């Protein structure tokens, strides 16, 4: 994959990470609100756990993409 495509993929990943971070923050607020009202929050916590897994996957993808970008940089310098 060419460098521009990798950079675009990285930008897309950063947007996804930001979005999931916002969703996690909102879900935490929902949980606090539910628990504060004495309501069951199990489903909300389950959703939060899923969002946190998704966040981790996006972070792993970002790490791999950054490594790919670094590799393409060093390869371009040696050619």
Predicted regions and their residues:
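Anionic, Ser/Thr-rich low-complexity intrinsically disordered regions
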Residues: 1-79
């Amino acid at each position: 994959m060419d460098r521009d495509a990798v950079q675009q993929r990285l930008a897309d990943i950063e947007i996804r990470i930001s979005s999931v971070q916002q969703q996690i923050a909102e879900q935490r607020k929902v949980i606090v609100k539910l628990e504060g009202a004495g309501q069951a929050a199990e489903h909300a916590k389950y959703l939060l756990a899923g969002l946190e897994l998704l966040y981790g996957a996006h972070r792993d993808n970002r790490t791999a993409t950054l490594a790919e970008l670094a590799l393409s940089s060093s390869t371009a310098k040696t050619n």
